[in-house]
Design a protein with these regions (language model features):
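PP2C/PPM-type serine/threonine phosphatase catalytic domain
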Residues: 1-251
Length: 251
């Protein structure tokens, strides 16, 4: 689900979610959320370009890849790293030649054979919901660095005036350094990817109450719940675009 929100004229977020079934590897899920830079011109172009490039990879390159070799973290990381470095260069060059600033975050997940591979640039996130809410990515932001250094408390994270300052951004970083992680997929859990607009005005305790695997039973109930959360965020005057993609693993 994605919503322009109550302030911005355009939705600079982009996302995709695909499922596939392989005889060899069973059910496969691929999802991406990108947040085009707010305040930067053409943010929606940057985020849509990244989502399209990754969608093409999943639909065209990935089937050939898994036909020849078993997918593993090293191979997927290498594939994604090449795409991200090329995108950083392409979007950066487009900005230079058109004299505009543009960029985007990304969080991408590939679930295959009970494993989840994650790529992250910027401050879009992946969470896991079981009997608690667990964040699975680290923000590449100034505020996250200050928290890590102990100069800012985690309680002040959402209210700090510098919360939108990114240390890494596709199209605007001289040297792009994506973060890659591998997780074992947990049974009977809800996973979600989101742009920062989805999380500023809601507490993790509330997300647990709404997205608990005990409550979420079908694709429809996931979509209904995400719409409910988006409407709640708009009532709370969230200023940003709001995007979230969620899925549940079965028990």
């Amino acid at each position: 689900q994605s919503d322009v929100g109550i302030v911005k004229k355009t939705n600079q977020d982009s996302y995709c979610i695909f499922t596939a079934n392989s005889k060899k590897y069973g059910n496969i899920l691929f999802a991406v959320v990108c947040d085009g830079m707010g305040g930067l011109e053409k943010g929606e172009l940057a985020s849509a370009t990244v989502v399209k490039r990754f969608s093409n990879w999943f639909e065209k390159t990935f089937p050939i890849l898994i036909n020849n070799i078993s997918p593993n973290f090293g191979i997927i990381k290498s594939e994604w790293d090449k795409i991200l470095k090329r995108l950083n260069s392409d979007i950066g060059n487009y900005g230079l030649s058109n004299n505009i600033s543009l960029g985007t975050t990304i969080v991408a997940t590939l679930c295959v054979q009970n494993e989840m591979y994650v790529a992250n640039v910027g401050d879009s996130r992946v969470y896991k919901v079981t009997d608690k809410v667990t964040r699975l990515t680290n923000d590449q932001s100034l505020v996250a660095r200050e928290i890590s250094a102990g100069t800012l408390s985690i309680e002040d994270e959402e209210t700090d005036s510098r919360r939108n300052v990114l240390l890494q951004c596709i199209g605007a970083s001289q040297k792009l350094e994506p973060e890659y992680k591998k997780y074992r997929l947990e049974q009977d859990a809800v996973y979600f990817l989101c742009s920062d607009g989805f999380r500023h005005e809601i507490k993790e305790k509330e997300l647990l109450g709404l997205l608990s695997p005990k409550i979420i039973s079908t694709e429809r109930s996931i979509n209904d719940t995400l719409l409910e959360i988006i409407n709640l965020l708009k009532e709370r005057k969230e200023q940003d675009n709001i995007t979230c993609v969620a899925f549940k693993t079965m028990a």
